[in-house]
């Protein structure tokens, strides 16, 4: 029997220096590259929006990401 691996959700701040800033999920190939899924974008007012693949990430936003704990740890190191 296959055991499911634990998943978690984390919040990542997008800064001017972030490699995600100014790019879309498509540009980054986010799901394939990080094996995680962006489930929402929070603006500086705290409003949460559903992600669209063509929308560019902007400095000051936060993204909410779901994935296996090991993949999330690798994502945080790479950003």
Predicted regions and their residues:
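Long, charged amphipathic helices and adjacent flexible linkers at domain junctions
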Residues: 1-12
